């Protein structure tokens, strides 16, 4: 139960920060210049983005394949597994479309907004970002029903696959409709696209993302009240406990998995990681929103925002893997069995010995 609470709280905090970030992203995209100036830091930002996208695609692929193999070999699928698999697929497509925009340098052409390729990629990127908000909303709603024996919503605790797929279909249709509106706004020339119309369209795009955020907040409040009644108030975390928690992160892949690890310690580790993400997103939101309000056409500002915005899709699979004991222990077992430095040195010595013979 505590593992599901960690996943839900992780989705709730990062959902809100990403929602604020997307609002400023829409403003900057509406006022994006027709030709992007090659600043001295542009190549540096590209160099930082490629490893980020590669790492995020690899981590989400591992998470997606693990759930696929679990379904194939066990012939059973939980609702939470379907949602996490869908979220991983969305993040893969999100990072892939953003990588195409960076690699092909669509922003460097003079007729960017008239290019069909640019519109298609921007449309897919916008749809994936909207789906990355709707999917954690469903995840939080399912995890909020934590006491089926008391509440009348017990029948919603284990929804069927048809209900989950129906929600996915509705989310895809809704976000594709929003993406069409977004691309139609980009199609207008700058003369016809005034600041008032841009703000109205940006607020409309922000409004459809506000409803999932509100749902997540209500479910989080409900779950927090229930946990308070069951477990009582949480202990206050002191400085020494924070230091021990950080050390737990560093020693996660250097020590064998212990079956008696305290769930409270794992929860506090996830909270510390979430605090760092929230701080990063709030700094980026302040930076990007100030540029969107003042209508500053700074390409370096846009590319910095792209890197920070995609950090959600790149790092969130690590949080899901760490929150899932089964995946984490499997990866840890593979590490100690095949990839740990002592094992690699032993294999190297055996190969050297066989070569000498």
UniProtKB/Swiss-Prot annotation:
MF terms (GO), sorted A to Z: pheromone receptor activity
Superkingdom of origin organism: Eukaryota
Membrane topology: Multi-pass membrane protein
InterPro entries referenced in this protein's UniProt entry, alphabetically: Vmron_rcpt_1 (IPR004072)
All ranges on the Cytoplasmic side of the membrane: 25-52, 103-130, 185-269, 322-357
Stretches assigned to the Extracellular side: 1-3, 74-81, 152-163, 291-300
Glycosylation site residues: 297
Family from the record: Belongs to the G-protein coupled receptor 1 family.
Entry function: Putative pheromone receptor.
Descriptive protein name: Vomeronasal type-1 receptor 5
